[in-house]
């Protein structure tokens, strides 16, 4: 259902502050959530959530709670409208916050589609603030020197997409830098 709304997004990406919004194709979103083994008990955070498609899909398909963190208020406004139109406002929230300072300690799943440098900068917080067993799924990019537990590629509309998955280790396990 979200796919029907995507063409209605305003064309503001070229003038928006920060990193450009490049939406993850819905088949990739769905596979990311499958690989994260999302279930109704999960709290899914999407850091740099854009139009909200990841957390909205997590709520629709899996009954999970979702939190979208996005700096651009226009995208947050649109994400909230999509959530309302799709009937998931009881399951999702969208915050106008900096993803480097937002509190995501209650997340059981974190999704990313950020530049590699941003992922590297987030790595220490992901490792120390998420509970052991939390899953991190990144569309396209790795997280510094932290090797993913699983990597998968898929082709959507002729474009190749990589999905990387990590599980936060217990504190005693060796941790990446």
Role assignments for model-derived ranges:
Residues 1-8:
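Bacterial N-terminal signal peptides
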Residues 41-50:
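Conserved class I S-adenosyl-L-methionine
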């Amino acid at each position: 259902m979200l796919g029907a709304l995507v063409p209605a997004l305003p064309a503001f990406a070229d003038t928006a502050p920060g990193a450009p919004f490049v939406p993850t194709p819905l088949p990739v979103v769905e596979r990311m959530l499958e690989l994260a083994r999302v279930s109704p008990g999960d709290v899914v955070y999407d850091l740099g959530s854009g139009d909200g498609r990841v957390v909205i899909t997590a709520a629709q398909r899996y009954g999970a709670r979702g939190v979208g963190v996005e700096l651009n208020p226009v995208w947050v406004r649109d994400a909230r409208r999509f959530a309302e139109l799709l009937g998931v406002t009881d399951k999702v929230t969208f915050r106008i916050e900096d993803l480097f300072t937002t509190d995501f300690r209650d997340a059981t799943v974190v999704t990313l589609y950020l530049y590699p440098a941003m992922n590297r900068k987030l790595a220490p917080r992901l490792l120390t603030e998420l509970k052991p067993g939390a899953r991190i799924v990144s569309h396209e990019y790795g997280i510094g020197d932290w090797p993913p537990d699983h990597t998968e590629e898929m082709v959507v509309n002729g474009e190749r997409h990589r999905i990387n998955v990590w599980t936060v280790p217990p504190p005693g396990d060796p941790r990446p830098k």
